Amino acid sequence: DGVEPIPRFDDLVTAFPDMRLNIDPKADNSVEPLIAALRTHHLLDRVCVGAFSDARVTRFADEFGPDLCLGMGPREVARLRLSSWRLPVGSFRGRCAQVPVRRGRVPIVDNRFVAMAHQLDIAVHVWTIDEPDEMHDLLDLGVDGLMTDRPAILRSVFEERGLWSAGG
């Protein structure tokens, strides 16, 4: 209802020192302040940064190298998809692919995509999954993470599968 204040990033990481964060800097002007905050709060072991902009992803890769969990940009995701069809595409910097199940009519996440990603030690996080049947299907494929707008449903799916601990 808009009555609670939106927390500042600095307050969030201070209030929840053990929380892992997935961060998508949505605008170019957010990159440098985020780089500064990651350094100030020593967050490299707690965050994964990914973006829909190859330029933003590259900026974080250049700044932190392999010390930062880096999500793949759109071009790298496309190369990983091609790699799942056994096409030679070179190496990857991103340590996780954060992707939709499909892009338009083009499927992205399938058993070949997940298998190739895992063969390359790349985690697969899929968004935005809100239906329990689809959650189960993706977990059966072996995806490493699901992003949802319905966390209570995701928790229920995890509980059904014995994947939810009392600590959350």
Which ranges hold each PLM region?
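Metal-dependent phosphodiesterase/phospholipase catalytic core, i.e.
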Residues: 1-69, 88-120
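C-terminal active-site rim and adjoining tail of enzyme catalytic domains
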Residues: 2-6, 81-168
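Glycine-rich beta-to-alpha transition loops that act as phosphate-gripper elements at the mouths
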Residues: 51, 74-76, 126-132
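Short hydrophobic/aromatic-enriched beta-strand-loop microsegments
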Residues: 45-50, 66-76, 145-149, 162-168
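Short gly/pro/ser/thr-enriched loop/turn and capping motifs at secondary-structure boundaries
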Residues: 55-58, 77-80, 153-155
